[in-house]
Amino acid sequence: MKGCLATMDKELWIERANDSLVKHFYEQQSDIEQREGFESKLTFGTAGIRGKFGLGEGRLNKFTIEKLALGLARYLNAQTNSPTIVIHYDIRHLSTEFAQIIANVLANHQITVYLPDTYKTTPELSFAVRNLNTTAGIMITASHNPKDYNGIKVYGSDGAQLSTDASELASRYIEEVGDPLQIDIPISKQNTSYIKPFPKSVTDDYMKHIQNMIGYIPKSDLQVVFTSLHGTSVPIVPELLKSLNFNQFNLVDAQCKPDPNFSSVQSANPEDHRAFDQAVELANKSHADLLISTDPDADRLGIAERDAHGHITYFNGNQIGALLLNYRIQQTSQLRHRLMIQSIVSSELTKSLARYNNVKYKEVLTGFKFIAQEIRQLDDHQNMIFAFEESYGFLSEPFVRDKDAVQIVPLIIKYASELKLYGKTLKDELEQIYQTVGRHEDTLFSHTLEGLEGKKKIESIMTHFRSNPPQEIQGLKVKAIEDYLTSEVYHLDKDTTSQINSSKSNVIRVLFDEGFIALRPSGTEPKIKLYVSLKCPDFDDVAQKINAMIFS
């Protein structure tokens, strides 16, 4: 009977394909991909929803977007009288159409919607929520995912992504909508009056906040190459740099045009060195010093440096974090009660640097909303000078409550320009940090373990660490094991336990005098990540051996 219902369901969807906005994508998919759309369901989680285009409740299409919008409308109206919302969208396929659908549904429920007439960045959305004092915000993006993906992120009134509790409540309202093919949403001219133009003054205010943060960029002969990887950071980043009187940059023209197919990049992810290939070519031609890339929604940023001999140095997220923290420490030397916030899987290097400079630090679960939560809870006398995640997400000043590559681009240029005046590079500065606090190094291993066997393997690894805590790993003596699922720390050296004041998450962190390793399974994919952050000789060899020991 279940099979018959599934077949009927599929037939109903196919009958509505012409109205779905995604018929073309569906027709390009394999039989397996098509079937997945009917056999799965998109779920609204702590990061909203993200998925492929296609037919069925497991895919993004006109009907599943209407369901999401209707659930969010009911959720918002249950939270407050006369709710307001701002919607931004990136350059991806159907981002504009999804934004209009959501705006129409919300307006139909007497929710005032601010909707721009062009694409915007994710940090601009976070800023706009705060600037316009709206109840919520929606960002339509799938970050650096492939071209056949899109997604919806929902933000609260503080400009941060919804908390876990709020996400769960919104999810219940969405699920209560039921079958998306049965939704009937009449659009009246009276209700479309709730859709307002997005005020240009908000973008101007955002630019002013960054201009005030940067001040000025000192004159040097620093040359920069910038690529938006076909995303949203052009034109805002070039306009921002020019407003700061910095004109010594070249754009990778082919990649600085919005393109939902990401035609000229192998990867639209600044973590991936391949994302810099065309930037490197241009840097070699123009003899540039600094290469910067942002991901498609401009919340994350990667950098590389070219020396006088044409050698390219790529910096990982932890190294960029250390450089930016070092610079912010220099910039804020007059402030008291300084604070840095980072995720629990980010480097020991930044913590050591903070300690050395008498800057307090806090660690939070992965996900920038947890950093935003800490910012929200700060006392008036505390000064948050920097926050970051090792996955290339950084925030210098909290007028935005999400990762913000737009504010970081001029900051890193200012830093590099100052160094250039003294004949130094970012690589030199990183080496100086290592000499000051020790050579803490980091690497990440990501394992995809498919199917039931893969799931069992992941569970077995996590269970083993919980029930049989190791005394040592590759000659490194274990001090403590932090289990974020039980919110407990087991101190092996004292044979005692203590509590972690944190939300629960399926993460285990093993602490040594030399640093830590962390294990973190994905909640949505058949993946598990191993983070290694250590100060030890032969780091690469030790990290490889730890990885082999755990996953052999």
Curated annotation (Swiss-Prot):
Residues given in the record as Mg(2+) binding sites: 143, 295, 297, 299
Details of cofactor binding: Binds 1 Mg(2+) ion per subunit.
Source domain of life: Bacteria
E.C. number, please? 5.4.2.2
Pathway assigned to this chain's UniProt record: Glycolipid metabolism; diglucosyl-diacylglycerol biosynthesis
**A GO biological process this protein is involved in?**
purine ribonucleoside salvage
Is this entry keyworded Isomerase?
yes
Per UniProt, which keywords does this protein have?
Answer: Carbohydrate metabolism, Glucose metabolism, Isomerase, Magnesium, Metal-binding, Phosphoprotein
Coiled-coil ranges from the UniProt annotation: none
Q: What is annotated as the active site?
A: 143
Gene3D superfamilies (UniProt xref): Alpha-D-Glucose-1,6-Bisphosphate, subunit A, domain 3, Alpha-D-phosphohexomutase, C-terminal domain
What does the record give as cofactor?
Mg(2+)
Keyword field contains Metal-binding: yes
The family this protein is said to belong to: Belongs to the phosphohexose mutase family.
Query: PANTHER family of this UniProt entry?
Result: PHOSPHOGLUCOMUTASE 2B-RELATED, PHOSPHOMANNOMUTASE 45A
Describe its function.
Catalyzes the interconversion between glucose-6-phosphate and alpha-glucose-1-phosphate. This is the first step in the biosynthesis of diglucosyl-diacylglycerol (Glc2-DAG), i.e. the predominant glycolipid found in the S.aureus membrane, which is also used as a membrane anchor for lipoteichoic acid (LTA).
Q: What's the protein called, per UniProt?
A: Phosphoglucomutase
